[in-house]
């Protein structure tokens, strides 16, 4: 990127001043860039973002090793999503099996989401300290075992207990998977790869819906879907064993072996000291990301978890029709997340999220009012195109906002705390819909799932817009060379490659000058 441009004012200080500046930057096409020369002198300029690149050329930038890490991370996230949606799309079957209400069944979803933040903290910190490989392997194996335990839960109470424990281990997947996948991708390709990666969640839903369609609508058929989920999770864990640790941790171990004198303070104590320093420095960013993830998790769970139930009850579809509608809906999510994640590398992370959320609001009438399978499938496709389009930006956005040494725990914990806060979303939708009735197109009195989901989604989408507009953005931040947390803070070999990597700096060496560029380093 060129180091010349129109002079810009320095980054504002303070929460409100920074928010005001970030909001103003949203309406300027050029990016605010901080340029630091070899003497530590900084200037700020406006620069046009790099032109949008052909996605094929971006794919070509990834080496075979990069693709390996990315695909394993994608598969882990897909398996995690399959395990979660295996329950949400079979709410009606499970309610019949345990002879209880659909609202009571969604209590299991609430418990799963409540405990995911604890798992994210535990497995995220372990992954940041010891590496991405074995924490993810153990995590996936335990998820598979708990899927099997769900099948054999004899009572509703036992079912809830297993799903609560399931949530604890499910929480550890997201942070490790996206950190492993994106930290090994070239910077220019991260927007596109983020969009594809996030759609592992939607693809997991599609696979679960296909499995549900394949096993039929009988009550006991839900067990077959859980068996498939167990095999998928255990299989991904076994697959991860075949590949090495992330290169950052291999490099750190090599450097520690060659220069033990530089790592005398490394260890658990140094790791926790780094954690405390990070929290003191980044607590505002942490709170912002939790608020953002709360909105986003409400956004996805409200618009999708009860969608199959909506088709079955309000629209009176049969199991096959509802499954086909759900599959097409999440196919739209896969397409939208990939395209909008890719575009975010050019138009900006915040603009991509805001425009997607706004368009999804406009589509709500078309999403809930039609009565035929074709119409609802088409509107569901485009609704989730933009819902998950906004979501497609999240993996790279969270990684760029994260302290670089905590790229597994920070995104994982903030995402899962947002999940925890939004955990009652499906339960709220079901409770309101089951207690509110409307007359459908056949003049029959039915539960009002459509209006409930529509009103809630409008409120949530507007919340996303209001939260994102004044928020921070670090598009283009380079975090792949960050020092490993707990390594004593003396790894000069790595540290000298980046001046202040937590502010999103990248290194550009041109001629005799070494210039350090920071893109959109707005603070939370």
Sequence positions of predicted segments:
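Cytosolic juxtamembrane N-terminal segment immediately preceding the first transmembrane helix
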Residues: 2-89, 96
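Residue-level signature of mid-helix packing/kink "hotspots" within the transmembrane helices
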Residues: 85, 113-121, 206, 330-338, ...
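Extracytoplasmic gate region of multi-pass secondary transporters
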Residues: 87-88, 282-337, 422-426
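Helix-breaking motifs and short loop linkers at transmembrane-helix boundaries and internal kinks
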Residues: 99, 131, 152-158, 186, ...
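Conserved MFS/SLC helix-loop-helix module at the cytosolic interface between two early adjacent transmembrane helices
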Residues: 118-156, 347
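C-terminal ends and interior cores of transmembrane alpha-helices
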Residues: 141-154, 358-372
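Glycine-rich segments within core transmembrane alpha-helices of 12-TM secondary carriers
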Residues: 189-217, 232-233, 412-426
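Central mid-sequence intracellular linker of multi-pass
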Residues: 190-192, 197, 216-280, 410, ...
């Amino acid at each position: 990127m060129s180091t010349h441009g129109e002079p810009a004012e320095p980054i504002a200080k303070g929460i409100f001043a920074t928010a005001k500046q970030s909001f103003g930057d949203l309406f300027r096409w050029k990016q605010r860039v901080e340029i630091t020369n070899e003497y530590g002198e900084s200037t700020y300029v406006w620069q046009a973002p790099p032109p949008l690149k052909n996605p094929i050329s971006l794919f070509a930038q990834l080496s075979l090793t990069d693709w390996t890490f990315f695909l394993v991370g994608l598969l882990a996230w897909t398996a995690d999503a399959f395990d979660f949606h295996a329950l949400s799309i079979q709410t009606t079957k499970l309610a019949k099996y345990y002879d209880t209400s659909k609202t009571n069944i969604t209590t299991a979803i609430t418990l799963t989401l409540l405990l995911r933040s604890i798992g994210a903290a535990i497995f995220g910190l372990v992954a940041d300290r010891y590496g991405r490989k074995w924490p993810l392997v153990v995590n996936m194996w335990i998820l598979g075992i708990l899927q099997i335990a769900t099948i054999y839960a004899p009572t509703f109470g036992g079912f809830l207990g297993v799903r609560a424990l399931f949530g604890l281990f499910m929480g550890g997947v997201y942070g490790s998977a996206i950190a492993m996948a994106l930290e090994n991708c070239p910077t220019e390709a991260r927007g596109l790869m983020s969009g594809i990666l996030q759609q592992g969640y939607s693809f997991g839903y599609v696979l679960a819906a296909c499995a549900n369609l394949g096993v039929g609508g009988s009550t006991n058929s839900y067990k077959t879907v859980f068996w498939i989920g167990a095999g998928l999770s255990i299989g991904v864990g076994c697959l991860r064993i075949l590949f090495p640790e992330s290169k950052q941790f291999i490099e750190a171990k090599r450097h520690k072996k060659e220069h033990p004198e530089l790592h005398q303070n490394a260890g658990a104590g140094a790791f926790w000291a780094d954690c405390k320093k990070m929290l003191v420095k980044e607590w505002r960013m942490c709170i912002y990301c939790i608020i953002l993830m709360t909105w986003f998790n409400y956004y996805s769970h409200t618009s999708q978890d009860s969608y199959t139930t909506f088709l079955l009850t309000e629209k009176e579809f049969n199991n096959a029709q509802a499954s086909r509608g759900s599959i097409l809906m999440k196919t739209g999510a896969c397409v939208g997340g990939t395209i909008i994640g890719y575009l975010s590398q050019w138009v900006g992370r915040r603009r991509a999220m805001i425009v997607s959320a706004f368009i999804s609001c406009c589509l709500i009438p078309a999403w809930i009012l039609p009565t035929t399978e074709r119409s609802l499938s088409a509107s569901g496709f485009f609704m989730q195109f933009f819902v998950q389009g906004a979501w497609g930006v999240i993996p790279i956005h969270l990684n760029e906002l994260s302290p670089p040494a905590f790229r597994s725990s920070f995104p994982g914990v903030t995402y899962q705390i947002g999940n925890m806060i939004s955990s009652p979303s499906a339960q709220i939708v079901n409770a309101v819909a089951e207690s509110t009735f409307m007359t459908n197109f056949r003049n029959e009195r039915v539960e009002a799932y459509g209006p409930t989901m529509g009103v809630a989604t409008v409120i949530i989408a507007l919340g996303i817009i209001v939260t994102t507009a004044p928020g921070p953005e670090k598009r283009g931040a380079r975090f792949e060379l960050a020092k490993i947390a707990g390594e004593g803070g003396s790894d000069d070999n790595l540290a000298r490659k980046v001046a202040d990597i937590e502010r999103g700096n990248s290194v550009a060496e041109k001629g005799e000058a070494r210039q350090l560029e920071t893109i959109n380093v707005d603070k939370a």
